[in-house]
């Protein structure tokens, strides 16, 4: 693994988007350099961990950031005065899980005692402090494990990150780049800011139809499986619906008027938003990208199947149809304050319809296909009564 400039560059762009630090245009930014170096130091420890046999640990512990083997998201919070606090952006040092894992794997217990008992105590002490292990295979099914996420309540964390994003977006502009840089390069910094919440969307979606579990063994007396509380799932859905709000997805006019076509030598790359408008910046595709990310994460085929089954086992739980109706509500009844936001709402509607159509046609579970098909037919009847406002979406339903 090479810890090169590309990794530093990514953290720089995240920080520049959030902080817009170049008010005068030529400021030095040692705080951003330290931000990026803190990530490199942590990543160095992460790779050493792999070298000595440690796997990724994505467990969301009440004890906080317990492992350098996690994929951490930079922690940026709001102060009371509206400023952003990045003093704890990345953790320093080795985590409690890392210490427990190395002790378990490498410690010599001197004194002729019972090594097995000593090893069990290492694990029990870790367990008692909520220092546990979940890895790559766990992140889609349970909100107990997530990549690039902070906190233990995914709904609250998504709302918090949307608040941070909103404040940073309200201040975003030419102060995100240095003097002499083409104004078009604001887009490079805009992308990670606009999508600041993207990984937390994945984490929050894992609450929906989520399953709590541990890798229990016979005789350990531990509860192996439980469903995520309906109240938590409903809060998660509320937070996810916020990410589809036209007012959250609309770019400020000041930003739209600041990004010209790219000059010679500054070609388009995959780090920029797609566009349908030729060389001109596209005001709608950022909303399309963000909305697609939310909707596609909520309506994965396996999550839809779990929603069907959890409603079957416990009618108080949100089911697939409940989630579909919330998405339709956001797509067709969400508040739009102007023609731009109306166009964004229509974009969200198109994203929702396309994803539900995909479930209706290709989901492996028969019940998912049936419920998705019925929901679309019911929606088509409602939209037919909304003519002409429902025309464009009715065409998608055909």
Question: Where in the sequence are the language-model features?
Answer:
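Sparse, context-dependent recognition of short Cys/His-centered cofactor- or disulfide-binding micro-motifs
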Residues: 28, 39, 54, 87, ...
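Generic beta-strand/beta-sheet core signal
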Residues: 2-4, 55, 59, 70-72
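Metzincin-family zinc-dependent endopeptidase catalytic domain
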Residues: 1-51, 76-78
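Conserved catalytic/binding loops enriched for acidic/polar residues
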Residues: 63-398
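Catalytic Zn2+-binding segment of zinc metalloproteases
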Residues: 48-62
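Soluble non-cytosolic domains of exported or imported proteins
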Residues: 34-43, 59, 184, 188-191
């Amino acid at each position: 693994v090479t810890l090169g400039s590309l990794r530093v560059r990514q953290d720089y762009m995240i920080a520049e988007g959030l902080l817009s630090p170049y008010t005068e245009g030529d400021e030095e930014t040692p705080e951003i350099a330290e931000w990026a170096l803190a990530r490199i130091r942590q990543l160095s420890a992460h790779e050493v961990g792999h070298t000595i046999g440690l796997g990724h640990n994505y467990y969301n512990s009440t004890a906080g950031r317990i492992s350098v083997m996690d994929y951490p998201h930079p922690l940026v919070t709001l102060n009371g005065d509206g400023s952003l606090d990045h003093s704890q952006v990345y953790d320093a040092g080795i985590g409690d899980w890392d210490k427990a894992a190395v002790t378990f794997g490498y410690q010599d217990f001197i004194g002729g005692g019972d090594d097995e008992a000593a090893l069990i105590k290492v694990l029990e002490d870790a367990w008692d402090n909520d220092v546990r292990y979940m890895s790559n295979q766990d992140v889609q099914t349970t909100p107990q494990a997530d990549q690039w996420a902070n906190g233990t309540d995914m709904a609250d964390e998504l709302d918090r990150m949307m608040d941070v994003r909103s404040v940073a977006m309200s201040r975003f502009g030419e102060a995100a780049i240095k003097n002499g840089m083409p104004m078009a390069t604001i887009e490079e910094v805009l992308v990670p800011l606009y999508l600041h919440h993207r990984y937390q969307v994945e984490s929050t979606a894992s609450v929906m139809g989520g399953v709590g579990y541990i890798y229990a063994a016979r005789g350990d007396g531990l509860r192996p499986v439980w469903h995520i509380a309906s109240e938590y799932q409903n809060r998660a859905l509320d937070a996810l619906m916020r990410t589809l709000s036209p007012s959250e997805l609309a770019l400020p006019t000041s930003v739209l008027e600041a990004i010209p076509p790219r000059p010679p030598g500054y070609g388009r790359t995959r780090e920029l938003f797609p566009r349908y408008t030729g060389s001109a910046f596209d005001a709608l595709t950022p909303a399309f990208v963000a909305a697609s990310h939310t909707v596609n994460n909520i309506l994965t085929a396996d999550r839809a199947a779990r929603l069907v089954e959890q409603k079957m086992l416990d009618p108080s739980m949100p089911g697939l149809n409940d989630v579909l109706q919330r998405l339709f509500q956001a797509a067709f009844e969400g508040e739009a304050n102007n023609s731009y936001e109306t166009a964004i709402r229509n974009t969200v509607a198109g994203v929702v319809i396309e994803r539900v159509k995909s479930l209706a046609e290709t989901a492996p579970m028969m019940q998912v296909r049936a419920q998705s098909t019925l929901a679309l037919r019911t929606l088509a009847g409602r939209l037919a009564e909304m003519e002409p406002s429902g025309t464009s979406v009715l065409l998608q339903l055909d």
